[in-house]
Amino acid sequence: MSHIPANLRYTDSHEWVLDNGDGTVTIGITDHAQEALGDVVFVELPETGRELDAGEEFGVIESVKAASDLYLPLSGEIIAVNESLEDAPETVNDNPYEDGWIIKLKLAEPEALESLLDATAYDALVSAEED
């Protein structure tokens, strides 16, 4: 059973989004996603300063099972990346919602956050996938 924090927003591709309250968000992959991937061995991080649209690829996460592209859930400018993942990619497995964050984004449209799933809707999505 995956852990799903109530204070986050989610995507149907299993990314989480934390509203930092200042027009920026922190983004990572969910507990469900890291469980499905298995042991993460590499995270390809984007360059800061890049402006991307929602749905664009921003990186790659590789595990012992597979490599998966990471897609931006919201449009904006990448303002920070979690460089500690370069030396310790397993942090995504150990602590996906805190130390395992991947990027921080300055939102192009802060109201777009409302279009993402809340914890209840994401829990229903995960439950449906597990059935």
From Swiss-Prot:
List the coiled-coil residues: none
Cofactor details (free text): Binds 1 lipoyl cofactor covalently.
GO process annotations (BP): glycine decarboxylation via glycine cleavage system
- Asked whether the UniProt record includes Ribosomal protein among its keywords, one would answer no
List, alphabetically, the Pfam families matched: GCV_H
* CC cofactor: (R)-lipoate
User: In this chain, where does the modification N6-lipoyllysine occur?
Assistant: 65
How this chain assembles, per its entry, is: The glycine cleavage system is composed of four proteins: P, T, L and H.
The record describes the protein's role as: The glycine cleavage system catalyzes the degradation of glycine. The H protein shuttles the methylamine group of glycine from the P protein to the T protein.
Q: What protein name is recorded for this chain?
A: Glycine cleavage system H protein
Natural source organism: Chromohalobacter salexigens (strain ATCC BAA-138 / DSM 3043 / CIP 106854 / NCIMB 13768 / 1H11)
The primary gene name is: gcvH
